Structures are given as C-alpha cells and as structure tokens.
Amino acid sequence: MTNWTLAARAEKMNPSVIREILKVTEKPGIISLAGGLPSPKTFPIESFAAAAASVLATDGASALQYAASEGYTPLREAIAAFLPWDVHPDQVLITTGSQQALDLIGKVLIDAGSRVLVETPTYLGALQAFAPMEPQVVSVASDSEGVLIDDLAAKAGSGADKARFLYVLPNFQNPTGRTMSEARREALVAQAAALNLPLVEDNPYGDLWFDQAPPKPLTARNPEGCIYMGSFSKVLAPGLRLGYVVAPRQMYPKLLQAKQAADLHTPSFNQRLVSEVIKNGFLDRHVPTIRQLYKGQCQAMMAALEQEMQGLGVTWNRPDGGMFLWLRLPEGMSALQLLPRAVERNVAFVPGAAFYADQPDDRTLRLSFVTASQGQIRTAIAALASAIREAA
C-alpha cells in the first residue's frame, strides 16, 4: 500500500460544517433552514435555454474553446457598466464563483502568520479559503450596524504585525443578515484609509434588497483601497460558478497570475451565457422577482417566529434583504446541542459557532428563509420552538 505524505497545510484542513449539516437534509421529510442555497424557483431555465441556443448559434466555437484568463470582454464591460462607481473593464477579473475569488485574494495577500481581520461573526467559506495560507485571523467586534471602528483601530496592528486586510460583507451579511449603516460605512472607509488598511468587500447579496437598496459600496468610496467581489450565483444560478473581482490596477496583475495558475479561465460558455442574459435585458427584469419572493419568505419566517417563540427568551434580527436571519437562544442553551433535537423533529439549521474565527458564541444560529415554502417555514419554526422548550 502506497504511503502518501500529506502537506502540512492539508493536515490542517477541515470539512465544511455547513456541508456536513447539509447531509442531514437528505433525510426524508427534513425541512432545511440550513443551506445558503438560492431558491430553485428563481432559476431562469427557459431564458437560459434561449440564451444558450443564441450563444451556440452565433459564437459556438469560441464559447467551447479555451479563452483569456481575464474573462470574456463583453461580460467584463457589462459588469464595469452596472457598478455604481467608475470602473474600467481592465479592472474586472472573472472568477469561478466568489469562492475562487477568496482563494486568489488569499494567495496574493496572505503569508503564513499574516494578520487578517474579519467581522464577528463572518462567512465560514472565507475562513476556509484563507486557512491553507495559515493566517492569524483576528475578529473585529461588530454590532447590528457592522464593524466597530474603535475595535478595528485596536486590532489593525502595526509594523510586521500589521493586518493585510479586513474582509467584510456590508450587505445582508452571511450569516447574520445585517446591513452596514451609511454612517458606519463612512467611518469604516475613513478609518481604514487612516490606518492604510486594505478592505476586501464581498457583495453576493447586495441586489436582494426588499424595499430599499443598501447604501453604496465601500469600494465606491475608496476604489484604490478596496478589492470588490461580486457574484451571479444568487441572482441567476450558483451552478454557473460565475463571480468577479474588481481590483485596483496595482493588484490586478498578481490576481490574474493566481487565476492563470488555478484554472486557466472560468468556463467560456457560462460567461457568454450570462453576458447574453444581461445584454437582452433579462437580468434587470429577473432580479425584482427574486426580491419579491424572498421578501414574502422572510415575512413568513418573521410571523412564525413571533407566534411560536413567545416566552422562550429567544431573540432574532429583521433583515432588510438577503437570505438569512440570526437567532439567539436563551442564556445557557447551546445551538450545537439543540441541533439533534431539531433534526428529530425534521428541521435543520446551522449552529452559529461555525461562523466565528475565535471565541464562538454557541447561543447563536443561522436560519435561511429562501428554499423552504412558507408552509414549511411555519412547520419548521414550530418544530424548532418545540425543541427549544424541551432543551430549556
């Protein structure tokens, strides 16, 4: 039997907590409030079929051929045009999903032991993407409006220990669903500039607002001090694996080189498919329908929580968009220990501890309101309340 010797970085890799929990959802009858999956109801299958036929008829050979690592030029031009600040297409790098963007950024900016700042809590996938580079991940205290500016200044470090960047999701954050306020954005950008601290802004959910668009991106306020990440996974389909990075010109070449080494380029056909649905105006018509669907789903979960959680000492936030809300259990109760009781009642969620880089809060949990039907949401919240009563 061959004796394979693993790299030290591989020894430190761990399975995704969320992916492991998603295995539970394969149990018959389970209602999953766990995954960060967009609703399949939003997948524009007929429009994709028409766009695919058009691409193959007009540009089929190129769509199926190797292509430039930067990405399909018309798609990069479209992205630059719809972003709310002055972006040149040469600053846009197409990635194989936002997850690859995180990996590329980590490879370019992180050395072993480098200090990297994140919100409290933060996106688990970012922690996993950065982990092979072996950073020192430091959590910055956060409240309902976002990162606390004083704590950012205290944890930015200096000299050789100065943080490489702060990773932040200002809009409908995963996992909490919170949105950073206008005042906090202004203060964050000003403080980051004063500290000479780069920002990595991740915005996969920004188009999924319910009644009012969120404030303008951090990157729009200081384009040279930020790397911006976007995605088509939540507004079209995650199976496309299509995201993008907008980078300052001084950063772009190294990100491009990392992309070339990683996978040469994002699938050409998928890029042309998305370019086609942008060009023909479908995306502009489609996104408002997603907003309305998710708003109704969120309202159903809010109503169910208000009805079922009375007197249980449970609190939760009220997101203005996105896919998630954040729930806090009563003092002394563990979300990790609650999960098996919930699964016994055919409901799954993600314990919040997985989203903390340090000092996890085991009283928290993430609920997704977009994939279950409104009837299933009511059933699931009632079951969750029953599990909480039993655990109390």
Positions of predicted regions on the chain:
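PLP-dependent enzyme catalytic core of the Aspartate aminotransferase-like
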Residues: M1-T2, E344, D358-A392
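N-terminal small-domain helix-loop-helix segment of the aminotransferase-like
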Residues: E11-G97, L104, K279-N280, A348, ...
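Helix C-cap/helix->beta junction micro-motif
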Residues: P28, M133, A194-L195, R345, ...
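Conserved core of the PLP fold type I
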Residues: S62-L195, V200, G206-G225, Y294, ...
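Conserved core segment of the aminotransferase class I/II
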Residues: I227-Q292
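Conserved glycine-rich beta-strand-loop-beta hairpin in the small C-terminal domain of fold type I
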Residues: S275, R291-M302, V314-R328, L338
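Conserved C-terminal alpha-helix-loop-beta "cap" of PLP-dependent enzymes
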Residues: L327-R366, T379
